Amino acid sequence: MFVDQVKVDVKAGNGGNGMVAFRREKFVPNGGPAGGDGGRGGSVVLQADEGLRTLMDFRYTRKFKAAAGGNGMIKQMTGRSAKDTIIKVPLGTTVTDAETGELIGDIVNKDQRLVVAKGGRGGRGNIHFASAKNPAPEIAENGEPGDELTIRMELKVLADVGLVGFPSVGKSTLLSVVTSAKPKIAAYHFTTLVPNLGMVRLDDGRDFVMADLPGLIEGAANGVGLGIQFLRHIERTRVILHLIDMSGVEENDPFEDYHKINHELTSYDPDLLKRPQIVVATKMDMPDAEANLEDFKAKLATDDTLPNTPAVYPVSSITQQGLKALLAKTADLLDTTPQFPIKGVDDLKHRDYTTEADADFSIDNPEPGLFVLSGDKLERLFKMTNLDHEESLMRFARQLRGMGVDDALRAAGAKNDDTIQILDYSFQFMD
């Protein structure tokens, strides 16, 4: 089964907790703090795999979780950092945040890696909090929580050349003749239900990847038929081979068919018609093909709706008429055509996990005497506070005061003994 869209839940590992410990060696009185730092949590990383052609592996496995870092230890020993969880995906996979729609990255290069959920840093042990006023601190941080999100992966096949056209115009037959691919071929519409890839190799040593895309029909850009589900795969192609059936068996006007497919391409993305396009007149071994081709060329010559008049190459996949000339022209176009930018990907600003601005805290007053605090920075500080040690709690209180939380609570109407809630933890407000 070909799967080209999937949602996956990913959870990076939390950092290990820092430790509160003291030196207790013989003959070392008042040895001081010796609690080590926690290890880094594992990240969830996508890695390109040239052997994969579909996202089928994610049909039943939808959750991936990286391991947490090890806790800090005595004698200033740092906990073990966790290994990253590597998820292999096919080339051409675009990754977005399923909740926000933010583009995270695009997997287009061999062995490329993309961090989609970053592991939390380890909490600091009490060796970091010693001072002249407090030489033996009972303060240590919990590990930073790892990122947790749902990502959407979308596969857009990586091919240099895309075959487009109505169903049963001969796309799969052409691919099977000029490459070693073996697509399903039958005498009915929509035989091809998934993209098929093949490598074309010319006698002069040039080669390129060709994709046979499922047949389009009117309204495809709006989801009719297989529709937009496979139009996305055209985005990465550099040259479009537009196949037109000249046999007349379907009793369609080849020129009208040509315009209908171009209309669907334009409706999906107007820039697609700016790409090099070759009209491939197929089934030229049929009796009426020559007459239909001449009529098509005459209409095309007077058509002023196109930005450029495409070259027309008559071929027959059965007799192999015209195939060498077609492939040579295609290779020539590829030699002079650069990669086209993928909209929303090439201008992507990759996430910077170290400089991302923290959200301001907010205060909610759902009922009299209850104030709920929330906010990314505030909640992260809370999660990294070791609630088992009073000095850690006092440090957290100072951090809140430094953020202006105390003043904001007073301004919101908080009074002595009112309940303050952060996540699942509650305490009393003391003015």
UniProtKB/Swiss-Prot annotation:
A Gene Ontology term for the protein's cellular component: cytoplasm
InterPro entries: G_OBG, GTP-bd, GTP-bd_Obg/CgtA, GTP-bd_prot_GTP1/OBG_C_sf, GTP1-OBG_CS, GTP1_OBG_dom, GTP1_OBG_dom_sf, OBG_GTPase
Intrachain S-S bonds: none
Domain of life of the native organism: Bacteria
UniProt-listed CDD domains: Obg (cd01898)
Cofactor or coenzyme needed: Mg(2+)
Residue stretches making up the OBG-type G domain: 159-335
The enzyme's E.C. designation: 3.6.5.-
Ligand binding (Mg(2+)): 172, 192
Signal peptide: none
Gene Ontology biological-process entries: ribosome biogenesis
Residues in OCT domain copies: 353-431
UniProt-annotated location(s): Cytoplasm
Family of this protein: Belongs to the TRAFAC class OBG-HflX-like GTPase superfamily. OBG GTPase family.
Subunit structure: Monomer.
Purpose of the protein: An essential GTPase which binds GTP, GDP and possibly (p)ppGpp with moderate affinity, with high nucleotide exchange rates and a fairly low GTP hydrolysis rate. Plays a role in control of the cell cycle, stress response, ribosome biogenesis and in those bacteria that undergo differentiation, in morphogenesis control.
NCBIfam families reported in the protein's UniProt record: Obg_CgtA (TIGR02729), Obg_CgtA_exten (TIGR03595), PRK12296.1 (NF008954), PRK12297.1 (NF008955), PRK12299.1 (NF008956)
Protein name (record): GTPase Obg
Provenance organism: Lactiplantibacillus plantarum (strain ATCC BAA-793 / NCIMB 8826 / WCFS1) (Lactobacillus plantarum)
